[in-house]
A protein has these predicted regions:
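Active-site and adjacent substrate-binding regions of carbohydrate-active enzymes
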Residues: 1-362
Length: 362
């Protein structure tokens, strides 16, 4: 449900404070209005509840507390919502250049935000888990390595996401390890890019063209909107005509045909992750505990049920990293469930670049 959190407005229509740095303004008066949950509950009662359907709402500006109101089954509203909080960790807060004001990626911020949502919705709601969609760029280009360790990186981020409680969303091409594109600015179709260029670069001159280009290459929505890459033939096998948008320059390297021909491809790793989630109740029902919150390279957490405990570990860096901080979780019951380096047998060995695994430890 597109921007569903904006369907209720304060009927006194209060003004925002006047600003000189932008022509348009969105904020607290646009979302989570006074009758929002009344309307959603009514929609559920009168329409949604009459069908065997799953509902997810796009809810920018929502906190975990608001998400609980949306997704608590007893409230009969929605099944889950898309949060944007983790998508904003690499932007400078309050900048007039908005999403184009890049802030260096800090894994600790990602862990903090995602863990807060895991813990605050546990047994009270449900998470929609995602790194990519039609409004977000490719995660391995944005926060990882899309060259030397492209496949390892894609599998590592997939492992982190699929080990959490909630419903993982896999956006087209994510299961192939597709990457961002780097086109000249005048070739981008996204109206957000075109408007921001005129507003920030041309008119207000708050960001240089070079810095804006780098930001577009990093975060433009068009990164995820190129035609899907089916094979290495003309137009990537997408069409015999002329596609509406330029193809990624890497379609001959990254495509469905190649993924299906390679036994250890990103595609098959995603299939294994999805099968694991269907087979293992712990991944659905177990609680969540973040480990090593201040580690700048390792994303690791526990999933625990009454019957067993798993550890999920991902080195989200290009370095070899020690697992010394996880020594207390070494167990004689270690059982690897999935790993993107096939020779991983336990916790003790150092983590190689973008190495990730899920392991039962009791």
């Amino acid at each position: 449900m597109y921007v569903i959190a904006s369907i209720s407005k304060d009927q006194s229509f209060p003004d925002y404070p006047k600003t000189d740095d932008r022509k348009y303004y969105t904020g607290k008066y646009h979302s989570n209005g006074p009758r929002l949950h009344e309307f959603i509950h009514e929609m559920n009662r009168e329409v949604l509840s009459k069908y065997d359907c799953m509902t997810v709402g796009e809810a920018p500006g929502s906190t975990p507390e608001v998400a609980r109101l949306f997704t608590d089954p007893e409230r009969e509203e929605l099944n889950m919502i898309f949060t944007f909080e983790h998508m904003n960790i690499d932007r400078i807060p309050g900048s007039v250049n908005r999403k184009w004001a890049l802030k260096p990626f800090d894994l600790r911020d990602l862990k903090r935000v995602m863990s807060e949502w895991q813990n605050k919705l546990y047994n009270k709601g449900w998470n929609a888990l995602y790194f990519e969609n039609h409004d977000q760029p490719r995660v391995i280009s944005r926060w990882g390595n899309d060259t030397t360790y492209r496949e390892e990186c894609a599998k590592a981020y997939a492992t982190v996401l699929h080990g959490m409680q909630g419903t993982p969303y896999v956006y087209q091409g994510e299961e192939l390890g597709m990457t961002n594109v780097q086109f000249p600015l005048d070739e981008y179709e996204d109206i957000e890019v075109r408007n921001a260029y005129q507003d920030l670069v041309v008119k207000n001159k708050t960001i240089s063209e070079d810095d804006f280009r780098k930001a577009v290459w990093n975060k433009s929505r068009d990164n995820a909107r190129v035609p899907i890459q089916w094979d290495d033939s003309e137009n990537a096998g997408f069409t015999t005509g002329k596609p509406w948008f330029r193809l990624s320059d890497r379609y001959q390297e990254i495509n469905v045909k190649k993924a299906l021909e390679k036994n250890d491809s990103v595609f098959y790793y995603y299939k294994d992750l999805i099968c694991l989630r269907h087979e293992e109740e712990l991944l659905t029902e177990g609680d969540y505990q973040l480990l090593l919150p201040e580690d700048e390279k390792i994303f690791t957490y526990l999933r625990t049920s009454d019957k067993e405990q798993w550890i999920v570990v991902a080195n989200l860096s290009e370095d070899t990293v020690s697992t010394e901080g996880l020594a207390k979780y070494v167990s004689d019951k270690e059982d690897i469930k999935i790993a993107n380096y096939k020779d991983r047998t336990g916790i003790k060995a150092d983590l190689r670049p973008y190495e990730a695994f899920m392991m039962r430890i009791r």
